[in-house]
Amino acid sequence: MANAEHLALLRAGASGWNAWRAWRDTTPDLSRASLRGVDLSGFDLSRTDLRGADLRGANLSGTNLSAAHLEGANLFKAVLDGADLAGAYLYGAQFLNCAQLVVTRNWQSAFRDEALACGASIPK
């Protein structure tokens, strides 16, 4: 379950969230959070626990999702253009497809299911 403090910081906006992330060495917990349709563009969500989060229709353009845990997250119609997926965990991500994946950065290094090979090898 998402940490209420982390969720409140996220809802306050990218500048406050990113400043908090710059000063805190923590793993934000947004697991199973309802973030449907939320504009998360430009957020630093690196190393964030987003397992099972509802990200349907969320704008994740330019978001840093490196090493984020997105296992089981619902990404139906999520916008991922330019998001950084270096080392992200995408196993079991729902409604994610190659068309969404290939417009991101560093997607080839993301840990993902065979269905999301998208012509590139999958890291072990």
Regions found by a protein language model. Give the residues of each.
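Tandem repeat scaffolds
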Residues: 4-8, 12-124
